[in-house]
A protein has these predicted regions:
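Conserved helicase RecA-like core
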Residues: 1-239
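Intrinsically disordered, Lys/Arg-rich low-complexity segments
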Residues: 239, 244-246
Length: 246
């Protein structure tokens, strides 16, 4: 009886390992149907899925494939891994961010909890969401952030997927994502609906391969900045949009 199939966040489903389950769903579908597939990025895997699932599809692109929104200013600060929390607190005190809210992405649940504790000890208004927190707790944290009751929300990629926060001025990548496409998803939380936004990444030497992959994906070299007093002991090699690491 199914007439319309809608696949939203298709790339994330594949990233999370649901390829087999999707194939099982597809095999049970009637041939005569309408299929709508939405994805913030368009990898080769997504292209293959679309080719197998869709017949004579109409493609609608709101931005170039895998491109970051032009309304978002992107830059990075190089820093040693062990000083990232200290650097973030320093930037909160010295940058002209005012009382604007920040969405901070961390790659692990343990890392989310640790950064939340570091910020709380420094007197910063912060909440956190990740997959180990009960759904009611995550929803409450999100509602508090949307209401402006906390300045910073720390989150993992999965927990923050699909967040729609009005007028969010700044996204911080405390850790670079393992999957380059997630960078586009992350910074897409800001600079929405014609507004401008900022996206800052704190990058250590261990993340140079991830940085190169991100720059190759978005086809641009991110502007670098060394913060005085936080110059890394372990240099982050120069990268560019070619994706090559020296």
């Amino acid at each position: 009886q199914l007439q319309v199939l809608v696949l939203d966040e298709a790339d994330r489903m594949l990233d999370l390992g649901f390829s087999k389950e999707l194939d099982e769903v597809f095999s049970a579908l009637p041939r005569k149907r309408q299929t709508l597939l939405f994805s913030a990025t368009f990898s080769e895997v997504i292209r293959q899925m679309a080719g197998n699932l869709l017949r004579d599809p109409l493609s609608v692109e709101v931005t170039p494939r895998n491109a970051a929104a032009k309304s978002v200013k992107q830059w990075l600060v190089t820093v040693d891994k062990k000083r990232k929390s200290e650097l973030l607190l320093h930037l909160l005190q010295t940058q002209n961010w005012g009382q604007g809210q920040l969405l901070v992405f961390v790659k692990t649940r343990k890392g989310v909890d640790q950064l939340e504790q570091d910020l709380q000890r420094a007197g910063v208004s912060v909440d956190a969401i990740h997959g180990d927190k009960p759904q009611p707790t995550r929803l409450r944290a999100l509602e508090r952030f949307k209401a402006g009751e906390v300045q910073i929300l720390v989150a993992t990629d999965v927990a923050a997927r699909g967040l729609d926060i009005h007028d969010l001025p700044l996204v911080v990548n405390f850790d670079l994502p393992i999957v380059a496409e997630d960078y586009v998803h992350r910074i897409g939380r800001t600079g929405r609906a014609g507004a401008t936004g900022l996206a800052l990444s704190l990058v250590c030497a261990d993340e140079v391969n991830q940085l190169a992959a991100i720059e190759a994906l978005i086809r641009q070299t991110l502007t670098r900045h060394d913060e005085a007093g936080f110059e890394p002991d372990h240099r982050v090699p120069l990268t560019d949009a070619s994706g090559q690491v020296p």
